[in-house]
Amino acid sequence: MGKDLTFTQTAWNEYMEWQRQDKKIANKINELIKSIQRTPFEGIGKPEPLKENLTGFWSREITKKHRIVYKVEESGTKIIQVENHYSDK
């Protein structure tokens, strides 16, 4: 498992929107990303493996409504979503 961090275009747009709109949530997202890079399957945000059509993906809680969804690949971690609970991947 590599240390590269990539975002889908949608996830990057969501991430940047949080940076502009809500610094408290943006800071929480940044903490989650750091934790994901250190220990992708444990740590803060209640890491949870996803099921069914999202098998292979993991999520962590940003808020009660919002999740960060990611996939750990050989080259590193890919952030899929930084917003609504399990929407599109």
What are these regions (language model features)?
Residues 2-4, 10-27, 44, 51, ...:
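Enriched for short, Lys/Arg-rich terminal
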